[in-house]
Amino acid sequence: MSVKWEKLEGNEGVLTVEVDAEKVNEGLDAAFKKVVKNIAIPGFRKGKVPRVIFEKRFGVEALYQDALDILLPEAYAKAVEEAGIEPVDVPKIDIEQMEKGKSLIFTAKVTVKPEVKLGQYKGLEVEKMDDTVTDEDVENELKRLQENYAELVVKEDGKVENGDTAVIDFEGFVDGEPFEGGKAENYSLEIGSGTFIPGFEDQLIGMQAGEEKEIEVTFPEEYHAKELAGKPATFKVKVHEIKEKRLPALDDEFAKDVDDEVETLEQLKDKIRKRLEEMKKNEAEAALRDAVVEKAAENAEIDIPEVMVKNETDRMLREFDQRLQMQGLNLELYYQFSGQDEAALREQMKEDAEKRVRVALTIEAIAKAENIEVTEEEINEELEKMAKAYNLEVEKLKELLGNLDGVKEDLKWRKTIDFLVENSKVAA
């Protein structure tokens, strides 16, 4: 097999690959064995048609596509390895020659990983985040816990206020017609949560239980349902019930409800302080690591291919969908409640996606420049930690992980950032 790599402008190039005729014939043989299983010709049992009869009846060309499906993946992978390139996208393949008894010639236009010209990455000046825990921090955490332990109590009299939960029926109309997803009964809506279309919740304020009202709103221009985007809508709303939050008293009993390891409110405050101190310390360390990485990435010169940004945006979208599903939601519901569509969300994610790609390429280049590698001992230590965290035997964890490349890459990533932090100038 012969391989030629021609670099084009930017991060693109063309592989020209020639596969030996002998290998092509092997591919045709394999293709025939696959295809003939489903062939029935009078005088022969299904799957037992001789090759010569098959080719006479259908032509050898009938085998070409299946032969290509067999030959191309292996030939392309070998060509990439021989050329020493790192494609970042699916290649665009064109067949130049495919004929029985002759070599296979194809071209593959590919986008490759860009060259990284590192700027300054040692001696970077960064500030360490203040990790002091104040009395106010402790009080704020106490208030948050108080909110979490609040009870929703029905208001016997009174009107809807911000922070209340209103149990409502609603039905929406656009141009006088009801629309899909615009109707619900006994829906619990927290006023001020921003869950509904802008202006909807505000107009519930002041309503009483049993009261009915028509609410006028306008769907956002970027609303996910194009047929509703930018259109005025009328919602008929009925309030069934109003619930208000009743906060528990901040006393020793509350402290024991929150944490059965404490007896008094003061003990709870001490425990909160220690937890916040640990949290702030970790946040400060994470912020420091992020800062050195961000500066090193900013100093690097990289012509990032658009396809890498798109692929990272795809990954971010999948991660976001997974987080929504953990909350019992999905992307479709998110689009409905937020007024966004996929295109708007992708555009919103694009800048972060590009930063992620830039950082990953920079870290990889620094690791290479500084010969940062991961030892077997380090991998085994990491596996021990992971096994302990998941309450598994190391061998079982290895079996579940299969390939340990991900563990190795994660360790190399962390070691490279450790190197950047150790070689930075940290100001308090």
UniProtKB/Swiss-Prot annotation:
Entry's localization field: Cytoplasm
Domain PPIase FKBP-type: 163-248
EC code: 5.2.1.8
Gene3D superfamilies named among the record's database cross-references: 3.10.50.40, Trigger factor ribosome-binding domain (3.30.70.1050), Trigger factor, C-terminal domain (1.10.3120.10)
SUPFAM superfamilies registered for this protein in UniProt: FKBP-like, Triger factor/SurA peptide-binding domain-like, Trigger factor ribosome-binding domain
Major subcellular site: cytoplasm
Any single Gene Ontology cellular-component annotation: cytoplasm
Alphabetical keyword list: Cell cycle, Cell division, Chaperone, Cytoplasm, Isomerase, Rotamase
Reaction(s) catalysed by this chain's protein: [protein]-peptidylproline (omega=180) = [protein]-peptidylproline (omega=0)
A GO BP annotation: protein unfolding
Keyword Metal-binding tagged: no
Similarity-based family: Belongs to the FKBP-type PPIase family. Tig subfamily.
Domain comment as written in the entry: Consists of 3 domains; the N-terminus binds the ribosome, the middle domain has PPIase activity, while the C-terminus has intrinsic chaperone activity on its own.
Protein name (Swiss-Prot/TrEMBL): Trigger factor
Gene: tig
